[in-house]
Amino acid sequence: GGARVLFLPQKPYIPIGTLRDAVKYPDEKSTASDADVVAALEAARLGALAARLNEVAHWAYVLSGGEQQRLAVARALIFKPDWLFLDEATASLDEPTEAAIYSELKRRLPNTTVVSIGHRPSLRQWHDREVEFQREPGAVGRLIEAKAAGSA
């Protein structure tokens, strides 16, 4: 098969059903155990939800925007994509939580290429390259290939 790709938008889709299924989405054939799901929730700073794996709910209405974004991160940790695209996927989080999330992604998905779209300068430290788009006549963008401090 081809590369495994996962896209996490600012407002992730969360299906109605059990919390377990919401975390495993979109991989219906996921063999992740409940322990794996709980570990992913804990890494995404949602450990308080661990006891609710069997609960059926419309999680998009139960969880706050930040919790939905963290659930999507737990999903990425379960899915283990080759390519992970984050489009403002941590915009609803405060900067310390965002840093903790990126640290977990880097630690738990060492072979995943992460492409982030965001506006916060704090995201720079988690990436090796930066493409900056500006509204200037004749210019689309410029590639900044400075090694971010502390990144691999």
Question: Which residues make up each language-model segment?
Answer:
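ABC ATPase nucleotide-binding domain
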Residues: G1-V5, I16-G17
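Intrinsically disordered, acidic/Ser/Pro-rich low-complexity regions proximal to membranes
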Residues: A3, K11-P12, A48
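ABC-family ATPase nucleotide-binding domain "signature/switch" substructure
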Residues: L6, K11, L19-A22, E55-A152
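Nucleotide phosphate-binding site architecture
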Residues: P15, G47, A91
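ABC ATPase nucleotide-binding domain helical subdomain, centered on the C-loop/LSGGQ "ABC signature"
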Residues: R20-H58, Y102-S103, N111
